[in-house]
Amino acid sequence: MARATGVAWTRDQRLIALNLYCKLPFGKLHKGNPIIKEVALKMGRTPSSLALKLCNFASLDPVLHARGIAGMSGAAREDRSLWDEFKANISVLGPQSEELLHNLLAFKADEEVDLLDHEKIQLQPSGTLIPPTGPTVATATVRVRRGQQFFRQSILSAYGVRCCISGINVPRLLVASHIKPWGEFPNERLDPRNGLCLSTLHDAAFDNGLVTLDEKLKVVLSKRLRAYFPQTALESSFVPYEGVAIRLPERLAEPSPDFLRYHREVIFKS
């Protein structure tokens, strides 16, 4: 495909770029990144153009601003509008952006476009799909899968592909954990404020109310978990982190205080 020069960005191209922004660290938003080069080629744009668009989105990210990172100034009105729309309607635009990226890069419907390497595109077999519930019907299965793929990669990437409690950085051992349960709150399923990057062990403990986070984002252990002490392996996985604040995400959104309050009051088994 010929590379566009001075050609206006389409809405679909902006959505693909915003999807990439959600998954790539700020330090990887440059024209030399192989992911940016390949996506730009498939889109018919230059790597410089795509990298600039990603940096424009970075200028709109409040978490980056809080870290003292400004991104590029002068984001287009269309970029600002899409950013606001994406935040307000992520349950629709998250899966849509993932499907657009998939159609651009993948060959099979059941492949996942994995960008967690941050410099290499990998096509992986899709993971286990959580069955649709409530108003979601079987015909929406692909959209649900794309949404889960988007949520997992964006949450893991926002936390630096590390468990926010333990610091474990093995992607296969990490989960994009939901603060408010996935099945009960469809409107918050893909909200980054409802996500934590946790190891599989800490995800299971959090999901079952054996650990929670206090108002200062410090780890709290339940009496039910402590009832299984002493066990060296168990204690070593939890006790060192008790009272320690979690690692915060590097972009997109910090955990919602309201969602965490719900977890403490409804799910946590003190």
Please provide the spans of the model-predicted regions.
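Short, Lys/Arg-enriched anionic-surface-contact patches
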Residues: 2-20, 142
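Short helix->loop/beta-hairpin flanking segments within DNA-binding domains
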Residues: 21-31
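Short alpha-helical "recognition helix" segments of helix-turn-helix
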Residues: 35-40
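Major-groove recognition helix of helix-turn-helix-like DNA-binding domains
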Residues: 45-60
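The −1 position to Zn-ligating cysteines in a subset of zinc-ribbon hairpins
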Residues: 46, 162, 175, 198
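Short Lys/Arg-enriched helix C-cap and helix-to-coil transition segments
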Residues: 62-82
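Short, charged surface segments at domain edges that flank catalytic/cofactor-binding sites
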Residues: 123-162, 180-193
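A detector for short metal-coordination/catalytic motifs
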Residues: 150, 168-171, 180-270
